[in-house]
Amino acid sequence: VALLSGGGAVEITWDSPRPHSERLLPALHQLLALASLRLADVAGFAISIGPGSFTGLRVGLATLKGLAFGDSRPIAAVPTLAARAAAAEGESGPVAALLDARRGEVYAACFAAPGALAADVLAESVFRPEALAAQLPQQTALVLDDGAAPCAQKLCQLRPDLRPLPLSLGRPRAACVARLGRRILETPAAARSADSLHPRYLRRPAAEALRTGQPLEP
């Protein structure tokens, strides 16, 4: 979780065996205490909207909806892959963000530069390594989580020009979500209400995929 105030940021991260749902609210209260603020002082919210873990996305969104219930403060829905790519600040040229999607696949998107909100180079989707290797530009930097490392290894065998960045850059950074969210909220029309938000899974849950015959969301 992170809080932006002026030009500074306060961020709390954790790696705990406890369920995400048990850690999130206490961390939010700790964050506000560190900044000597109350929840009522917060002008707007940003959330990493997906793709990602079904459970993680649901917990995060349910928590935000609880905080914003009956509230008119704006919410920014930040694409998760854009936030991950933003961690490669200082890189020049295209940067692709990869997250483990299991089944030998990754969620991926490619951006013209770190900090871009729109995946103009390659739109977010679910890829096998061979398909992704055929579509990434030359010398693309790769931001990846631990689970995507096997895919990145195969990618680099197919495309030696690709540049995997340190795995530490692929860890979730709430401050990146907050900074992109603030940019979204600078355009009032882009702000969302709590009841209009839905997780961006990309890959449909198995039951829905079977019912619709479509494994991916539009």
Give, region by region, the residue ranges found by the protein language model.
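N-terminal beta-alpha supersecondary unit
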Residues: 1-49, 171
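Surface "functional belts" at beta-alpha junctions
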Residues: 9, 13, 19, 74-172, ...
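Short, contiguous clusters of charged residues that form electrostatic/catalytic patches at enzyme active sites
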Residues: 22, 26-33, 83, 127-130, ...
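Stable alpha-helical structural segments in soluble proteins, enriched in small hydrophobic residues
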Residues: 31-35, 70, 88, 177-185
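DPxDG-like acidic metal-binding loop motif
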Residues: 46-77
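Flexible, glycine/charged-enriched surface loops at secondary-structure junctions
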Residues: 191-195
